[in-house]
Each structure stands twice: as C-alpha cells, then as structure tokens.
C-alpha cells in the first residue's frame, strides 16, 4: 500500500461538525477499500486567495492515508460528486510526517503574542504631534506662500 497526504477544502457555510462528518465519511471509504487513515487535522476556516465556486473562505482538512490506489480513487470520485467539497489534492509521500503539520505549527506560532507587533511605541514621534512642517525647498512653505496663478476666466 502507498502513503498519501490528502487535503480538501469544504464550503464556508457548513459547520465544523459537518466538516468532521465529511472527514469520517471519507475515512470510512478508505477503510472499506482496505486502507488506513492515520493523522487527521482540521485546520479550520481560512480565507482563500481567490474565489472558488463563489466562496471566499473554506474549511481545510488534512488526512494521512495508507491505502491502495483504488481506495484513494474511490474517495476522490466521491469528493467530485459532493457539493460540499470545493477542492481536494492527494500527494503520494515516502513517509508521513511525525507530529503536527506545518499549518498547525504556524497556528501555534500565531497564538503566541508577538514582540515586534504594532502597538503603542515609546519615544519617537508616534506619541505626539510633530509640529509645523519646515519650509520646502524653493522658498514655498505652505500653500499661501505660492504666487497666485492667473485664471483664464478673469481675463
């Protein structure tokens, strides 16, 4: 049997419980065809880079699969039929990653407070008015210093 990583996107208007039900449904398809599903990750609702079938967001889910090719083909066939699945991608891998995926590690990183984030700054000019601007080069400081241009309708 071959090893696969499978990611699919589900519509934004279904609930997280319905996404879990989809994962269980496709897990059942794999197991019915002689395969095993290892790690399952639900990455949650994320914004899409571009609209897919009129959706701006989607629920992302990842499954590590150890199954024959026929089982994966059957799962993909059922995903093509389902209206709840926007996109899917299956990749053959040499071995499954241990621990959380890169997306889950990124989520853990994003949960921590950042040191260099935008916040109130000490010192500098961000906390007070900088005062009047210095005169511009050429002798004109503000709009009142400019010579009036003749208007064509006054002639």
From Swiss-Prot:
One of its GO terms (cellular component) is cytosolic small ribosomal subunit. Gene3D superfamilies: 3.30.70.60. Keywords: Ribonucleoprotein, Ribosomal protein, RNA-binding, rRNA-binding. SUPFAM superfamilies: Ribosomal protein S6. It comes from the Bacteria. The keyword Ribonucleoprotein applies. InterPro entries: Ribosomal_bS6, Ribosomal_bS6_sf, Ribosomal_S6_plastid/chlpt, Transl_elong_EF1B/ribsomal_bS6. CDD domains: bS6. GO terms for molecular function: small ribosomal subunit rRNA binding; structural constituent of ribosome. GO terms for biological process: translation. Residues 94-155 are annotated as: Disordered. Binds together with bS18 to 16S ribosomal RNA. Belongs to the bacterial ribosomal protein bS6 family. NCBIfam families: S6. This is Small ribosomal subunit protein bS6. The gene is rpsF.
């Amino acid at each position: 049997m071959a090893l696969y990583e499978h990611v699919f996107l589900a519509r934004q208007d279904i609930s997280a419980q319905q996404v879990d039900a989809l994962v269980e449904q496709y897990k059942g398809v794999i197991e019915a065809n002689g395969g095993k599903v290892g790690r399952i990750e639900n990455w949650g609702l994320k914004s899409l880079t571009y609209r897919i079938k009129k959706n701006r967001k989607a629920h992302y889910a990842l499954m590590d699969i150890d199954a024959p090719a026929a089982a994966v083909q059957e799962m993909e066939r059922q995903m093509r039929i389902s209206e709840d699945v926007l996109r899917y991608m299956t990749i053959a891998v040499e071995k499954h990653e241990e621990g959380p995926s890169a997306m889950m590690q990124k989520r853990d990183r994003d949960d921590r407070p950042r040191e260099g984030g935008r916040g109130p700054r000490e010192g500098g000019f961000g906390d007070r008015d900088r005062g009047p601007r210095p005169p511009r080069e050429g002798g004109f400081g503000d709009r009142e210093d400019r010579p009036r241009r003749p208007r064509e309708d006054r002639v």
